[in-house]
């Protein structure tokens, strides 16, 4: 049961081709399927969309190096799901920071960076197999936070539920067997700049996750 694709995964030809082009253009980048961050025995799972070109695709760690990570990891630290110093710039010179997660794991619906940050439906479906296996392997999992509608739909699909019965809405809470799914708008710079999401709004979602787990 594979919870992550191989580093040279070619299951999605378009993504593999884009990855290879990035190897040529950005040879110092990670340029491979980005593995999840955090332990499998965690009670909280954050599911994002996909690595950003100059974020996780560069650093090799989810939400590390782009604006979305600042919002996400700030909230996780606030509610004791993370500790240490979040210093993404260290990854770009071959180093690492002291940042770590507590009882939390961060993953993505799609593990490879897609062109224009837009995976196709078939790419989402293909990579969903890894996310499904990952969720199944998290035996202590209590809460999933989906960042954005695609991540939400991926989780609903994994639990074999009808999408129409589980509408995405920021702050919404859904019961999936013995797991609670919380919805949030994605922590992207675009959502922050347009006012769709604020740090306080996102903090409230992570605070709810803490209440459900505590």
Regions found by a protein language model. Name each.
Residues 1-168, 174, 179-214:
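A polyanion-binding, active-site-adjacent surface
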């Amino acid at each position: 049961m594979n919870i992550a694709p191989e580093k040279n995964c070619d299951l999605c030809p378009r993504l593999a081709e884009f990855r290879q082009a990035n190897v040529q253009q950005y040879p110092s980048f990670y340029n491979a399927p980005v593995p999840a961050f955090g332990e499998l025995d965690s009670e909280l799972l954050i599911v994002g969309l996909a690595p950003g070109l100059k974020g996780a695709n560069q650093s090799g760690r989810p939400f590390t190096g782009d604006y979305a990570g600042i919002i996400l990891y700030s909230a996780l630290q606030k509610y004791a799901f993370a500790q240490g110093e979040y210093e993404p710039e260290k990854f770009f010179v071959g180093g690492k920071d002291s940042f770590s997660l507590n009882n939390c794991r961060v993953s993505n619906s799609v593990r490879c960076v897609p062109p224009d940050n837009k995976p196709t439906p078939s790419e989402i479906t293909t990579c969903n197999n890894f996310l499904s296996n990952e969720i199944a392997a998290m035996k202590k999992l209590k809460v999933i936070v989906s960042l954005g509608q695609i991540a939400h739909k991926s989780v609903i699909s994994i639990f074999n539920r009808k999408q129409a019965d589980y509408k995405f809405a920021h702050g919404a809470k859904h019961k999936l067997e013995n797991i609670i799914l919380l919805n949030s708008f994605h922590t992207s710079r675009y959502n922050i700049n347009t006012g769709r999401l604020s740090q306080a709004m996102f903090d409230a979602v992570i605070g709810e996750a803490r209440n459900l787990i505590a």
